[in-house]
Amino acid sequence: MSAPVTLLSGDNGSGKSTLIEAIAVAAGFNPEGGTTSFNFATRATESSLGGHLTLVRTPGRKPRTGFFLRAESYYNVATEIERLGVTGSYGGVSPHQRSHGESFLDLVAHRFGPGGLYLLDEPEAALSVQGCLALLLRIADLVADGSQFVIATHSPILLACPGATILEIGPGGGIEPVSFDQAEPVVMTRAFLADPARFLGRLT
Ligand SMILES: Nc1ncnc2c1ncn2[C@@H]1O[C@H](COP(=O)(O)OP(=O)(O)OP(=O)(O)O)[C@@H](O)[C@H]1O
Ligand SMILES: [Mg+2]
């Protein structure tokens, strides 16, 4: 994963979160999300894969900062941000007092900075189409400032991230690079939007 932005695609249960969590653990992040200094655990469910991964770093490119964002446990991360009294680094308002999407956009706007390693698991879970486009703009700025992103996503909009490498995990567990036009969420969304009735006809 040497590209500035690597997007992990694949069906539900294909292993994206397991992989991104293992990278996070190997990189020293809290398995439940947050920065490398977060050290809370509500329930240890991480796989042991992280202990078997060796991360290869470009010499002289140790991340200056970073964040592991997992949509499913951001509530607990928000509680930790409040407990540590560091809301100032997140836009000044506790994530608990913002909407789900607002709190994500606060995070990327205020806490993310140059030269960072950012591991994001389905950030689109909180975001509107506009929010996804705002995230793409912020990613472009941070990449220009030397940051690296690994993002698990089902979003055709995030898969359009310029210059990104898309790795798709197939049904057999194989990981293949694919183009934007080949990526499954793009193919399926295009087919659905071209003729919703064809898909929905089976429901009635
Ligand atoms: N704590 C766990 N213990 C055992 N198996 C697990 C655990 N968490 C997930 N799995 C299994 O590992 C497989 C991969 O799960 P994973 O969460 O990585 O998928 P995913 O690609 O992120 O899916 P989704 O798109 O639904 O988020 C699934 O079959 C899942 O049931
Ligand atoms: Mg997942």
Where are these regions (language model features)?
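C-terminal lobe/lid and adjacent interdomain/linker elements of RecA-like ASCE P-loop ATPase modules
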Residues: Q130-I151, S155-T204
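ABC ATPase nucleotide-binding domain signature region
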Residues: V5-L7, S17-R83
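Conserved P-loop NTPase mechanochemical-coupling segment
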Residues: A78-R98
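Pre-Walker A (Motif I) flank of P-loop NTPase domains
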Residues: A3-T6, G115-G116
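GG-anchored amphipathic helix commonly corresponding to the ABC/SMC/Rad50 NBD signature/C-loop
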Residues: R98-E122, Q130-L142
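The Walker A (P-loop) glycine that initiates the GxxxxGKT/S ATP-binding motif of P-loop NTPases
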Residues: S9-G10, E122
